[in-house]
Every structure is written in C-alpha cells, then in structure tokens.
Amino acid sequence: MTVNLTELDAHEQPSDQMRAIWKSYSRADKEELLLNGAIDDLEKPEKAAEFVVAGTVPAATLTKGFAFLGSGFDAAASDAPIYYHPLLPGLLIFPSIVPLEVQKTLLSKLIHRDLSVPAHQTNMHLHYELPYVERKPTDGEGEPEDCRQSFFSHSPDSPVRFQPKDPDVHKPLSMKQVMDRRLHWVTLGGQYDWTNRVYPEEEPPKFPPDVAGFLETVFPDTIAQAAIVNFYTPGDTMMMHRDVSEETDKGLVSLSLGCDGLFMIAPSDIGKMSEEERPEDVKKQYLLLRLRSGDAIYMIKESRYAWHGVPKVLKGTCPEALEDWPAEDGRFEEWRGWMKNKRINLNVRQMRE
C-alpha cells in the first residue's frame, strides 16, 4: 500500500456505517456478545481457523527484550506465534507474548514511575494541578526505585486533592476519584497536541529507555519515540479513528494489560470497496478482536492507517494474578484490587524518520 502522508487528515471521521456498527457493539450486553459469534477470538477454534500463521518471534529475542525491563525473569520457553487475518494482512497479532511477571513490571514502570513524571502530560493537566509526590533521595529506602513517587503512595482516602485551575468551573478531586475513573491517559516521549492533532516541534521528554529497549527488541522496525498509555474501566470506549499525525509510516505497537478489550478495525477504504474487489477468502468488512492481557498487535502496511477503536472492555476478565496490583510485597495495600477493574493499553509509535 502506497500512502501519501500529506493527504491524510487527522480530523477525518469514519463512515456513518462504521460508526453505527461500533456503537452497536458498545451498547451490546457482554454475555450476548460472547455468545453471538461476532467476536474474532483466537482462542475459539472456529474463529482461529480464519487466521493465518505469519511467523514467530524467537524465544531468544523475547528473553533479550524482557531483560531490558529487569533481571530475574524466566527465559521465554518457546517461540511466540504471529497471526494475521486475510482482511488485513498487515495487522499482526501476538497472543500472550508478554508473560504475567513481565506484565506486572510494565505496570510498575508505566504507572508508578512514568505517570509520576511531570513532563508526561495526562488528560488531567488541562484543568487540574497534579499533586506529584516529592521525595528526598533518602526517602523510600528499601523501596523499588520505580515506586518511590507513585500516586498510589497516597491512600484512596488521602486529603490530598487535584486542585482545579479554575475553581468556578471544576471541583477538587480526590486521589480515589482520579485513579478510579478520571484518569484516562498519559503520554510518554513525544507529547501529542490533541487540539491541533500534531506533535510539537520542540525536543520531547526522553522516552523511557527500558521500555523502549524491550519494544525495539521485539518490534525492531519501529523506534519507540512516543506513546499513549490508556486507562480503561468497563464502560469506557475509544471511538473509531486513524493514527495519521506521524511523519512516517512505521508500524504502531499496542500492548494490552488487565481486562480483555474488544478491538474493532476496518480497512481505511472499506466503504469504497465492492464485494467483487475484496479478496475471495474475505467476506468481512471489519474485525472485532478480543485482546487479552499480555497480547500485542503490530499495525503495518495497509493496517497502519486502518480505522480502529475499542467499543467495549469486558468486565471481570482481568487475570487473577494481576487483580490485586498495585498491592504487592506489603506495599500499596489500600489499593488492593485496583487492577481488577482496569484495562491498560500501551500504544507506541515512531513520530519521524
């Protein structure tokens, strides 16, 4: 697929048809969805038969990538399979590529550490002053470095508040209100301008090198320059959109942690494609993938500019081993169970060549 990047409009909307389909899934009952056969689930044999094996990620590559995040992880036991669907051969799917212990480490780095960096903008920054935790170098002795400035250092009923920039418009928010429902995203590296849909020209904050090392080992064709970490609670959604603000067509990486999410994706030209123009083995107009904790997708080729969104997060699907996070090793006990009701999605891209 050849794409003229200058012709892509970040403000363009999906077709009315795609929006209507997305909306129907967002409103559908979870149990009904799980039974009606609409979901493309690689763990269901009848659905898995529609997918094609694209290759594997060698176990040695995975082990090398995990080592960037810390020591002590078990070596990857086997190569990780990669799949695609004929509708979108450039949408590469990596089921269960991130083991649970590595998932926990990623959560700690992204939420304890990176969320606590003032240069990393969040959806809260527009209207609120964030109560960052300031600690002296001697504080937190014996505590992991990634945890020392975590917002979870405040208890859920802490008197600390997110103070509004304009008290006439917004009310102060408690730590529990923000961490449970009001925090929706944080950006790493390049800080995207959501109003103008562009990346600023000034030098961005440094992308976390350990996370970058992991990603670039497993997905070597994409340099990790910018990311958005999405915080979903069941009931939250992401509208259909295309990622077209980058000045390169390098692939997008997406990692899922926590509750399962339904990921809807459709070719960018699907509304213009007649049935005769579609590949003979493709009857679908879109995919509705069930992405589980530890799954990754890599959007390249024609899928790089495909319409995609998240119509539903499936309540009650967080792996049991993650449910209690961030409570572990005697820390953050008052927040035990926070992750049980969350889906964290790390979306990574290269801004420029």
From Swiss-Prot:
Residues 223-352 form the Fe2OG dioxygenase domain. Its EC number is 1.14.11.53. GO terms for molecular function: dioxygenase activity; metal ion binding. It is found in: Cytoplasm, P-body. GO terms for cellular component: cytosol; nucleus; P-body. It comes from the Eukaryota. Fe cation binds at H241, D243, H308. RNA demethylase that regulates the stability of mRNAs through an m(6)A-dependent manner. M6A is a modification present at internal sites of mRNAs and some non-coding RNAs and plays a role in mRNA stability and processing. Plays a role in pathogenicity towards plant host. This is N6-methyladenosine RNA demethylase ALKB1. The gene is ALKB1.
